[in-house]
């Protein structure tokens, strides 16, 4: 899903306040020119963008990517299809030479019986400058302070439950259209389960609804109303015309330990000779602070993100030493840091660029406990953001799966193995598969850490190794679990309806075997004070 530059956001959007310091970045006399960024020295793919028109009516994003990269040997840095079935797409490259080559190859090329038209595309205006030019002088965005939804808990749960009911009802209607043979079955289910295709159990939640997040990514920037350097949350997006950062003091789902850590590093940034990063001018250094926290182990990890700009290796080394000294001996020593990393976040030249991580001091990981088991959390490892509610989530998964000692649990896209390892004692064996080798290494360590002997983990893409891994199962009865988001599998239950429908399609060359039909669903609220909610749905065939 990162191919389409879409990010899952289960957290909140809020902001922070900071303090003015010397060495501020000055806005140039072209500050109101929305195209001034094209004249700067830093890389932007907008300089080398083309537009492809007359695309086929039916094609997939991955098909287009494969055509460009594999068949035509082009090297795009970004592919954007603004409108589904719109017949056109933008493609960006690293250089003028690569752009010219692409234009020559693509213009007049025939694909799926369509003759493509390729031409140079105009760069988009800087959205921040564009919005700023449109704002009246008295519309000060920094006067806003975004807070989380503070509805009563019962009101939040009722709202989420209603959204889930709507999604399941839509699923039932779409399933009948896709597989008319199931019409009678759907009507019977709806009469039995209050117009729903399956039983929907009451929404489950943790009693801890404030300060529950075990991971937060704080922005580092300037609060426009005070001029102070601040570690907190963006008040709005760049596209909305805001780069201001606001305070986290009143943000409900950030725990006190994280607030103390953020404020501590904020003091370091305010006293630093290096300025905060400017998203508009691409100057400055301090960009982000990621905080991870083990509630049950009281272990804290900090990941300091900065743009190194033109800093020498010696200057970076000195900066790293300053951070270490601050948290070990200076004012930051009151904040007990278990693990600290420095991350160099440079401007990405392609979607495959991964910011480099450098371990500064402490352990290379922290740990957290789920359902009594201990799990290692590396800096970039996925881990559910609400530890207390994750206990409830995993217990509910085990309940729905109906695991027994003659069942194989197939943990698809298992990550670091948390689900499978928590449920291992309820089944005969666990087989986990995951495309990221580092995650599989963590999963194996976690299995050893918890003395789990009936779990094996395999590296590979699900579509490539699922059949071979399933073939290893010792039992005829197999229960598969998949935890989105994955490519083609959204995490939002409203967007996942298509996947549900595909599971219930009639047997064909594409859809082999009998259809999977919904049996029971359980909502679990992992994200109080936000509109998001997890939905576990159990299908059988």
Stretches found by the model and what they are:
Residues 241-281, 285-287, 308-348:
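Internal alpha/beta scaffold segment
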Residues 141-278:
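Extended interfacial segments that mediate partner engagement and assembly in macromolecular machines
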Residues 88, 215, 532-536:
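Short hydrophobic/aromatic beta-strand or adjacent loop that forms the aromatic wall/cage
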Residues 33-38, 46-88, 93-103, 111-112:
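Canonical RRM/RBD RNA-binding surface and closely related RRM-like beta-sheet modules
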Residues 3-18, 24-27, 55-71, 77, ...:
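Rossmann-like S-adenosyl-L-methionine
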Residues 110-131:
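Low-complexity RS/RG/RGG-rich segments used by eukaryotic RNA-binding proteins and nuclear co-regulators
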């Amino acid at each position: 899903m990162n191919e389409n530059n879409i990010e899952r956001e289960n957290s909140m959007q809020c902001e922070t306040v900071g303090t003015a310091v010397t060495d501020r970045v000055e806005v140039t006399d072209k500050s109101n020119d929305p195209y001034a960024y094209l004249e700067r020295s830093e890389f932007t793919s907008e300089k080398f963008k083309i537009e492809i028109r007359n695309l086929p009516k039916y094609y997939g994003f991955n098909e287009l990517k494969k055509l460009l990269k594999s068949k035509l040997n082009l090297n795009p840095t970004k592919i954007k299809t603004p409108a589904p079935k719109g017949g056109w797409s933008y493609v960006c490259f690293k250089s003028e030479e690569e752009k010219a080559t692409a234009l020559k190859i693509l213009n007049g090329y025939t694909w799926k019986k369509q003759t493509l038209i390729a031409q140079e595309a105009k760069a988009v205006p800087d959205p921040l400058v564009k919005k700023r030019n449109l704002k009246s002088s008295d519309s000060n965005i920094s006067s806003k302070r975004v807070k989380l939804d503070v509805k009563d808990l019962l009101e939040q749960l009722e709202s989420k439950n209603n959204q889930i009911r709507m999604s399941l009802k839509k699923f039932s209607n779409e399933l009948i259209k896709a597989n008319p043979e199931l019409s009678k079955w759907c009507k019977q289910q709806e009469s039995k389960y209050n117009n729903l295709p399956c039983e929907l159990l009451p929404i489950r939640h943790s009693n801890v609804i404030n300060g529950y997040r075990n991971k937060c990514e704080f922005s580092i920037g300037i609060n426009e109303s005070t001029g102070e350097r601040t570690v907190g949350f963006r008040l709005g997006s760049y596209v909305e015309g805001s780069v201001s950062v606001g305070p986290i003091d009143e943000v409900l789902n950030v725990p006190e330990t994280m607030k103390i850590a953020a404020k501590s590093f904020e003091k370091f940034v305010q006293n630093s000779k290096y300025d905060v990063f400017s998203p508009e001018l691409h100057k400055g250094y301090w960009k982000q602070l990621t905080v991870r926290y083990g509630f049950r182990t009281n272990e804290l990890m900090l990941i300091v993100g900065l743009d190194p700009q033109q800093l020498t290796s010696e200057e970076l080394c000195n900066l790293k030493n300053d951070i270490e000294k601050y948290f070990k001996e200076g004012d930051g020593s009151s904040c007990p840091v278990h693990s600290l990393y420095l991350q160099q976040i440079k401007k990405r030249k392609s979607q495959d660029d991964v910011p480099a991580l450098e371990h500064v001091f402490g352990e290379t990981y922290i740990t957290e406990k789920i359902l009594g088991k201990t799990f290692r959390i590396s800096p970039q490892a996925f881990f559910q953001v609400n530890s207390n509610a994750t206990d409830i989530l995993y217990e509910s998964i085990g309940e729905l799966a109906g695991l027994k000692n003659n069942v194989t649990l197939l943990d698809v896209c298992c990550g670091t193995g948390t689900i499978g390892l928590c449920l291992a004692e309820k089944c005969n064996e666990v087989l986990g598969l995951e495309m990221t080798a580092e995650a599989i290494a963590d999963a194996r360590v976690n299995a050893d850490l918890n003395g789990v002997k009936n779990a094996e983990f395999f590296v590979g893409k699900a579509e490539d190794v699922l059949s071979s891994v399933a073939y290893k199962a010792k039992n005829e009865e197999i229960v598969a679990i998949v935890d989105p988001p994955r490519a083609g599998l959204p995490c939002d239950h409203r967007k996942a309806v298509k996947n549900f429908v595909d599971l219930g399609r009639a047997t064909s060359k594409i859809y082999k075997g009998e259809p999977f039909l919904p049996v029971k669903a359980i909502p679990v609220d992992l994200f109080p004070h936000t509109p998001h909610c997890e939905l576990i749905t159990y299908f059988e065939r």
